[in-house]
Each structure stands twice: as structure tokens, then as C-alpha cells.
Amino acid sequence: MVRFIFVTGGVVSSLGKGITAASLAMLLQAKGFRVSVRKLDPYLNVDPGTMNPHEHGEVYVTDDGAETDLDLGHYERFTGVTACKCDNITTGAIYSKLLKDERLGNYTGITVQVIPHVTNIIKDFIMSNTNGFDFIICEIGGTVGDIEGLPFFEAIRQIGNKLKNANCLFIHLTLLPYVKTARELKTKPTQHSVKELRAIGISPNILVCRAERNISKSAIDKIALFCNIKPEYVIPAIDQKNIYLVPIAYHNSGLENKVLNFFNINVVPSKLDKWYDIIDKIKDSNSKVKIAIITKYHKTQDAYKSVIEALNHAGIYYKYKIDVLWINAENLTEENINKKLLDINGILVPGGFGVRATQGKMIAIKYARTNNIPFFGICFGMQLATIEIAQNLIGIQDAVTEEFKIKGTKIIEKINKNCEDATIKIKNAHISKCTYSEAFECDASTVYTNIHEDSNNLSTDKLQIETNFRNMSDIEKTMRLGAYPCNLVANTIAANAYKSLEINERHRHRYKFNNEFQNIFEQHGVVFSGFSQNKQIVEIIELPELRWFVGVQFHPEFKSKPFEAHPLFIQFIKATIEYNKSNEQQ
């Protein structure tokens, strides 16, 4: 029988509900249980794909092409379980489905209301696709008291009433603010948060209290008394220097054992060797390298969350600390770049969209290329690298990308329908796992076929959804989302890094390198080391005569994990370490 665990938050947002849910999932896995983690977001956007990264952070892309909340990245990195679109839902997706069903007459003329119709969709989402799991952990976005979150809280309240304590547990994460003048942690906000939660019919079974310092026994007893919870079920969540220390901190507090005790499940020893190994490497990391990330969305680091973590994973691999220097590309010029990038060991240009800040990024790419500094370009970063090479190395002064809609030689062009299934979203998920959530993006014009990217190689493990193009915008038609296979060229940087000639990586782009220019690029030393299966889309470029200069069309950061760093990030950090050592010897 599957058991449901709901993680809610109070007092303030950004307390770490996603890290808590991911940590608990990992700790239960370490005891041999099968766990799925899901995120329910109350905002009205259908998905975060069109949201400003300054507001929402990065868009995390799953294998099956879903644009999801960045917390799914935490779930994958902590548990190693591949997420899919059925692990994330929003109010926008719910209302989109509900209104389509109403227009199609599926509600047979009755009055459609928040209760029961919206809440029923939420409950169906939570309780679907549970086969094969011992626990389903659901994180509810936002904080208790938010008006947009009320249908979600009502839905999980109803689930709790139906399943009772034997199969349902509520974890509430709150903040204990430290008041310097009083020299103590204040419990009153937590008390009021629990009061708010209980007012809508949910009594938390476990309280996780976030604090910047240790919580005294008297404070825990006070929280337990006023929140009607046993003291042993008040779990401290003390700030950690590294997020990968959080799971072990929860383990030391007995979080997973408290969960098992609540469900009357026998507690068995945990297998946490790989996590202790990670912690040892983090603590042994005394040396560091300095990486400049050339950003467009500079106001929040969450816009590049997976990139940061992938760098850290490679740092853990080599027992090196990664010192990230955030560079606002809009402020980067030929005149100030020497000063701004002083003493850096590597340059990374991540993905992005639009013309803003591109000039600064290209200046950084030129600086890396001409000064032989390790460079890594991801998605748009690779595209800009080809434009910089065209302009400054090959001599195509008017080289541009079609995305900017300006006159010039289009080195980067829009993906078209001839580019190997690039006009639709490939669904690479486990088909049996995603049966319910497909209803949120399919309508009567949708046709399902089981097909591989190569039409001559049928495969039942991939789901291709071909949607009526008349109902799609031009942007939707050309977006290439999700995991696609890629063939590598032997004896290249990429092939040596992966130790394989066939890989599978996640994509999120609607433009590609113009293959008409491949020959002239090769004549100037560029190696095209990765292609889509029919060679229509360039996936990887290299400048092998330099220390390390690689651009990739995909997003390798989405597949990196603390215990399995991505091979390209490993090689990039290796190059920065060697570059740093060579500078120290001079």
C-alpha cells in the first residue's frame, strides 16, 4: 500500500521545502523504499516555460520534454530518480484541463466549481501513477495562507480524511527567526502558521523548524505544547554551508525514522555510504578554482541553479571548491573585461533567449578564445560561440542568429520541420508512469504514436505526440524539448569525456547551427563532434587546439548529480584546475 507524505510551508517562502522533500525521499531510499516526489504549484501559469527567470528561477526540463519547477532538479539530484511531466502540476494546467472539459460537455451541464471539480483534479493527480512506489512525497508550493493555494490544501485535507494516519502524513516547514536584541529564536510565527494550517482542517504530524542556529530544548518543548505535537516530532533544520549536508543533518535528527514510526513501519539500517563519501569530499576540498558565469538573468542565482550544482558536482569529484564569479553581461565591455575577469580559471556562458546581453557574452567568448582560457558554452552559449568564431576568426563580419530578426549571414537558423522530429515535443518518459498527466496538454486533435526519432527504427519506449499545427504558435512548433539521442565523433573531446559514441541529453531550444557553414568552420579548426541522429542538428563544437573550448546545444547540467558528476563538467573543471596550476607556476 502506497503512503502519501505532504510537505507544506509557512511563515515565509523559500524555506527549503524542495530540499526537505528531496532529502526525505533520499533517506527513505537509503532504507530500501521506492519513492516518488512531486511538486504542486499554485500559480496560474500552465508551466514555468514562459516565466521570467528573475521571478521563478530556472526552467527544469525533464527527459519527456516537460518544462517544470526547479525543485524537480533537487528531486532528481538527491534521489537519482528521473523526473517526468507527471511529477509537476500547476493551477494553470488544472484550469486549462477543466475549461476544455467543460467546453466539450464532459461535465454534462452541471455547475463547475472549485470544490469538488478543481480539488478532484488535484486529488486525481496526486493519487495517479502510484504503482511500484512505497511513498509518494508531494510538495505544495507557496505558504499556508496564500489564497491561490487554498484548493491544494483542501484537496490534501480530503485525502488525509480518506486515508487516515495509517497512510497519510503531513510535514509542515516553518521559520524560527532569530531576534538579536532578544538573543533568542522566536516561536510565535511557527505557532501562528500551524494555527492557520489547522484552521483549514490540516494538523501537521511533523514540524520541521528552519533556523540559523541550534534550537534549545525549551524552544522545542514550547513549539510542541502550542502546536499540539510531540516534542520528538519537532525536527530542527539548521542552516548548512552546503545543501548536500542537509540530508545527513536530517538523518542525524531522525527525520526518516520518525516518518517510519508514524506509519508503524519497522526501522531498518540506512545505506548512506555514498552520501558520507560526498560529505568527506566536500570537507576535504581545500583548493578552489574561480569560474566566471556570464549571465543575462543576474538578479537571482536560481536562474542558473542546475549549472551551479553541476559545477559543484565536478568540484566534489576533484575535491575542489568552486568559486563562482557572477558577471552581468550587459555591463561587460572590451575596455573592462580584463579587470572584471582578472584571475578567473574558466568561463561559462549558459543558456538564454533574446538579444539582450548578447554583446557582453560574445566579448567574454572572444576573451576566452584569444587568451586560451577554458570555455564552456551551453545551448545559447554554444550558438553565440559559433557567431563569435564566424565574426572574429573566419571573417564573416555580419554573422548573426535568425533569432534576433536582423539582417546578416544567418549562422544560426530556426529549426524547421525537416530537422528530425524537431517540430514536436518528444516524450521519452516511462509511458506507464505518465498516463494521467498527458491529459493536461492533449486535446481532441492529438494523435498518439509510439515511434523513435528515426522513423525506420520503431521503439515502444518513447511517446511522440503529434499535435495539430493549426492550434500551435510558430514558437511552439519549433521548440525542441526533452531528451534526444546524440552521436559523437570518435577521438574528440566529447567522445573522450563520455567514453561513448552514443549519448542522450536534454534540450530546450528552437534555433540551431546552419549546416551550410560547416565546411568553412572546419577549415578554421572547428571540430563538430556531436550530431543528432540524422546529422541535421549540430550538438557539440570544439576548438581542439585550445586548452578546452567546448559548446553544446543541449543542457548537460540537468543530468548531473552529486554522486555522478556530468562528464563534460568533470572535464571542464579539470581544465580549469590545470589552467590554475599553470598560472601558479609562472
UniProtKB/Swiss-Prot annotation:
GO biological process, one term: 'de novo' CTP biosynthetic process
Subunit structure of this chain's protein: Homotetramer.
Family classification: Belongs to the CTP synthase family.
Documented EC number(s): 6.3.4.2
Misc: CTPSs have evolved a hybrid strategy for distinguishing between UTP and CTP. The overlapping regions of the product feedback inhibitory and substrate sites recognize a common feature in both compounds, the triphosphate moiety. To differentiate isosteric substrate and product pyrimidine rings, an additional pocket far from the expected kinase/ligase catalytic site, specifically recognizes the cytosine and ribose portions of the product inhibitor.
Active site location: 379, 555, 557
Record field: catalytic activity: UTP + L-glutamine + ATP + H2O = CTP + L-glutamate + ADP + phosphate + 2 H(+); L-glutamine + H2O = L-glutamate + NH4(+); UTP + NH4(+) + ATP = CTP + ADP + phosphate + 2 H(+)
Gene Ontology molecular functions: ATP binding; CTP synthase activity; glutaminase activity; identical protein binding; metal ion binding
Residue ranges annotated for the Glutamine amidotransferase type-1 domain, each copy included: 290-582
Encoding gene, per UniProt annotation: pyrG
Positions bound to CTP: 13, 146-148, 186-191, 222
Binding positions for ATP per the UniProt entry: 14-19, 71
Binding site for UTP: 13, 186-191, 222
Region feature Amidoligase domain, mapped onto this chain: 1-265
Activity regulation details: Allosterically activated by GTP, when glutamine is the substrate; GTP has no effect on the reaction when ammonia is the substrate. The allosteric effector GTP functions by stabilizing the protein conformation that binds the tetrahedral intermediate(s) formed during glutamine hydrolysis. Inhibited by the product CTP, via allosteric rather than competitive inhibition.
Positions of L-glutamine binding: 352, 380-383, 403, 510
Protein's recorded name: CTP synthase
Gene Ontology cellular component terms for the protein in this record: cytoophidium; cytoplasm
Amino-acid positions noted as binding Mg(2+) in the UniProt annotation, renumbered to this chain: 71, 139
NCBIfam families to which the protein is assigned, alphabetical: PRK05380.1 (NF003792), PyrG (TIGR00337)
Pathway: Pyrimidine metabolism; CTP biosynthesis via de novo pathway; CTP from UDP: step 2/2
Keyword vocabulary terms for this entry: ATP-binding, Glutamine amidotransferase, Ligase, Magnesium, Metal-binding, Nucleotide-binding, Pyrimidine biosynthesis
